[in-house]
Amino acid sequence: MAMNKSVGLFSSASLAVDYVDSLLPENPLQEPFKNAWVYMLDNYTKFQIATWGSLIVHETIYFLFSLPGFLFQFIPFMRKYKIQKDKPETFEGQWKCLKGILFNHFFIQLPLICGTYYFTEFFNIPYDWERMPRWYFTLARCLGCAVIEDTWHYFLHRLLHHKRIYKYIHKVHHEFQAPFGIEAEYAHPLETLILGTGFFIGIVLLCDHVILLWAWVTMRLLETIDVHSGYDIPLNPLNYIPFYTGARHHDFHHMNFIGNYASTFTWWDRIFGTDVQYHAYTEKMKKLGKKSE
């Protein structure tokens, strides 16, 4: 009986979604996107799409999203939005970071990306246009992946800060006390594997099409580059997401080394009280700001 009720509710929800979808205006980008997708399927193998497609998506999105933060250091107007104004970026630091990033991308992440095709084949994940999910279902699954990754990240990140292992692995990521966008994936290879596992758990549980893999890569990179940007930009649309950590939240983690362990959402830090120092610091800064006015 309970099973029948659940099926009935699911069917009703699906019908409601279909009805709302029928009322929405036609997406002008859908036809060009469909043509490009079909062309890709006709001209490339699944292995090429899964491997080189995933690599291109990752590298393009990573450096494209990192570019604004890199340019901000040369724009005097943007200085007022930099969170740690007393710690400007240096050429030496950024060059060291870039070399570390490229090593991780091509010697750690690329071998993992090469397994994407075998992953999709093992789990029967489709590539075809006919089974392409609607954008809002993909978005919902990406949010599900974000919740799963954030949970994994909080507890494993906190473990990496344990005094007995911190200096061996996670200390590499904290070489930069004032983070900047491209530094988001600068880490010890073991950390890349440990924290990166959280990215794949959601994919294993929720992936219904290869497009979700690329959409989730895009969302995760956008988020991690934003929180590592070192800038608190007004009207940043990401800051309107409920419980979103944001640049100030994670910047404090780099400045203080303790607390604010979550990657995307604030609830785990709030539940376990690991944001107490952060809130005390923000209150102190507010009082100092009022006194200086």
UniProtKB/Swiss-Prot annotation:
Its main location: endoplasmic reticulum. It is a multi-pass membrane protein. Signal peptide: none annotated. It is found in: Endoplasmic reticulum membrane. Pfam families: FA_hydroxylase. Keywords: Cholesterol biosynthesis, Cholesterol metabolism, Endoplasmic reticulum, Iron, Lipid biosynthesis, Lipid metabolism, Membrane, NAD, Oxidoreductase, Steroid biosynthesis, Steroid metabolism, Sterol biosynthesis, Sterol metabolism, Transmembrane, Transmembrane helix, Ubl conjugation. One of its GO terms (cellular component) is endoplasmic reticulum membrane. Ubiquitinated by MARCHF6, leading to proteasomal degradation. Its EC number is 1.14.18.9. The chain crosses the membrane at residues 55-75, 100-120, 199-219. Pathway: Steroid biosynthesis; zymosterol biosynthesis; zymosterol from lanosterol: step 3/6; Steroid biosynthesis; cholesterol biosynthesis. The histidine box domains may contain the active site and/or be involved in metal ion binding. PANTHER family: STEROL DESATURASE. Belongs to the sterol desaturase family. This is Methylsterol monooxygenase 1. It comes from Rattus norvegicus.
